[in-house]
Structure formats: structure tokens, C-alpha cells
Amino acid sequence: MTKRKGKFLLAALICLVLCFIWGNSMLSGEESGAVSGGLLDWLTGTFPFLGWLPEYLLRKFGHFSEFSLLGFLLAWFFLLWDRQWLHRLALPLLFGMTAALTDETIQSFSPGRCPSVTDVWIDVAGVCTGIAVLSLCFSLYLLLQKRKGMSNEKVI
């Protein structure tokens, strides 16, 4: 896959993840509760050892995991655009924080929902985790390539 196609694919995936996140934020409180409750029922039915899991914790984990994926994809996207480490880290974080704030703003207009500063912090922690995972994967990739004798100029 060419670098250009990779950028396009990552941009499309980022847009899909944002549509999923923001689409869930547009649900009313009742609809959102029904989705969370259905997922919790499925999880506890499939994995009985999760019977202790409260819906509140499931919702917070949902925020964290959605934004971890977003952070990973954003970091990968900016890795393809710019090779400077500051840009690779700062731009995905900035975009992720903006997405988190937008998410909570959308919720403020959804019936039965209200924005939460706690959710913004959970979302940003997810973005940071995604960026860290991508950074670790890329560092390991560079290390393996270096051991094989490839120069960094041939990477990406």
C-alpha cells in the first residue's frame, strides 16, 4: 500500500470512529441507557464472571476504548504526515482533546444527557493511551528494522 493510500484509509477510519462516537452522543439518555444495558446483558451472559460489572463502569470503559482507538489512528495518521516527534504527539493529542470536547458538547444538546468533565478526562486519557500504544509499536518496528540493517530513511 502506498503512503498516499495509507493516509486516505486512516483519514476514512478516523472519520468513521468520530461518526460512531458522536452518533452515540446524539442518542437520548433513554436510548443510550438501552444500548448500554443491552451490551451489559450480552457481556454478562457471554462472560458470566463479569456479572459484577456495573453499567456506569461499562460506560466509562466505552469512552476510554473509543478514544484509545481514535488516539491510535490519529497518531498513525500524523506519523505518516510528519516525522518530527513533537508533531506526532502534539497534533493527535490536540485533535483528540477537541473531539472529546465536541463529544460532550453534543451530549449537552441530547435530551436526557448532560456533559461531564470526568468524561472529557477519561476521553483524553484514552487518546493518550492510543498515542502511547502506537508510539511503542512504531519504536519496536524501528528497532527491528535497525537490527535487520535497514536505515531509518527507508522506514515509512
Where are these regions (language model features)?
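"…centered on the first transmembrane helix and the immediately adjacent amphipathic helix/loop
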Residues: T2-L74
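Membrane-helix interface segments
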Residues: R4-L9, R83-L93, S116-V117
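Small-polar-interrupted transmembrane alpha-helices in polytopic inner-membrane proteins
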Residues: L16-I21, L89-S108
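Membrane-interfacial alpha-helical segments at the cytosolic side of multi-pass membrane proteins
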Residues: E66-L80, V127-L142
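Interfacial helix-loop-helix junctions of multi-pass membrane proteins
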Residues: A100-A125
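Short, charged juxtamembrane terminal tails flanking transmembrane helices
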Residues: R147-I156
